[in-house]
Structures are given as C-alpha cells and as structure tokens.
Amino acid sequence: NKAILPVLWQLFPNHRYLLDTDFEVNDLLKQTGYAVKPIAGRCGSNIDLISAQDELLDKSSGKFVDRKNIYQRLWCLPNVDGKYIQVCTFTVGGNYGGTCLRGDDSLVVKKESDIEPLIVVKDK
C-alpha cells in the first residue's frame, strides 16, 4: 500500500532513500515532474509520468483506474542498451534472498516486463 509513502516523507523529509511523495500535487512536484500512482496498485498498473513541463512522458493501463492516488517526485529509471532497468531485491527470513533485474522499453516497468540476466559474484 503506497499510502505510507507520503507519511514516510513527512516523518523523514529529504531522506536519501525516499522521494518527495504527497496525496496531492504540490508546487515542488510540479517543478520536478511526478509520477501518479494508485495507492493500492500493483505491477506498474495505472501509472502516469508527468514532466516538469506538465507533459505526459508515459503511462500504463490496468485495473486500478478508479483508485485514489499518490503523487511522487519523478525519478526515471536508468536506460541500459535501450531498456529501462529496475533492480529488485528481496529477503527470505530476514536475510538477503536474491536480486533480479526488470527491463522494459517504456519508462514504466510492468508485470509483463522482461526479467534481465543478472549474475552476482563474490567480492575478492
């Protein structure tokens, strides 16, 4: 549930691991560009990416169109060889469980986006 994100931003403003997030579009979000995300959305569904010039950069469809939204500072994923890449990590039993890369031709990574090759090597 993304409703926690504006609360976290209020509790920890300018934290390096958080993006400015609000329940409405504020002046700072208008200046930087922002993502519109359904509070209870999943897998990149129903996301709009709006530039600082108020232009629609990308959008995705889905079944969460009638949900309340949050508005989050725009931070575009890095483009590697023509794909926008998202690094996903997860834990199992409180320990590192794994990492995968999701890649898509569009700015929004979705459920059907590709799983990209990844190898983890031990530090020397």
Model-derived features with residue positions:
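Active-site nucleotide/adenylate-binding loops and adjacent lid/helix of ATP-dependent enzymes
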Residues: N1-C76
